[in-house]
Amino acid sequence: MAWLLFMDECGHDHNAVPYEVRGGFAIADSALWPFVQDVHRLELECFGARLADYKSEIKGTKLLARDRFKNGLRDPVFDKATRQALCRAHLQDGLEKKPPGKLKLTAYGQASLKMADGIFDLLERHKALIFATAVPRGEGKPVKGEPPPPDILRKDHTFLLERFCYFLEGKREMGLLVMDEVEKQEDRRFVQRMHDYFQKTGNGRYRSKWIVPSPFFVASDMALPVQVADVVIYVLSWGYRREREMTGPTRLEIAERYEHRIDKLKWRGEGYDGVKTFRSFGIVCVPDLYKPRK
């Protein structure tokens, strides 16, 4: 059996969210297709339509925007048929650039929260695990006048691969990386850095025994699991603060609803540094991105 780690990133613009997060969720290959089918069914149950048919997609910024919470938590609470009909009308209004109506916004907000809740239910049901790194906003920028080497994989990436490798090694199973494509030239540079890491460093060569060194890039609007990964890392950035170093601003409505879900899904296991074993976790904060660790 193999495990696929579906990854996305948020906060790389260093503006909107308190943490630059990279990562997502790992799922066994045998569970992937049942999971995708269940997400499709959930989408139809919530919205009464496929969002892709209306030039939209599942994203954390869309499902869990502040106005989605505001609209989704107000009365009236619609029954399924009414909610679905209003959601389809709202999506069609978006295509036709019509102003949204209050009832449609309420229904769409309820559907969005139901979708986000259901995603975490399905991740648990299909025994997925969360692996992610969080860099405080602003720390992702190198020190002025001291640009990092362009061919070196960033510390947060290596920590993410490290935790995924610990998990795979414990299972004695292989892992594949599936990533959201961003910009072709930047993706090529990342692949080269990844290649150098796995070929030219001792840790990388060892971890290539468990992680296939060549990542797969997919368009998120055509890959539902990558869209789910986007929801996971958006929630993590705004609502997960159980790591000691994560003290950034929080959206309480997200934290209260989802922090315990993230904590339940994060990987817990053991790592090994060549001398001893120690407890390790799938989520790690990296506040010292460009500083050496003692």
Please give the residue ranges for each predicted region.
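Phosphate-ester processing/binding pockets and catalytic centers
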Residues: 1-294
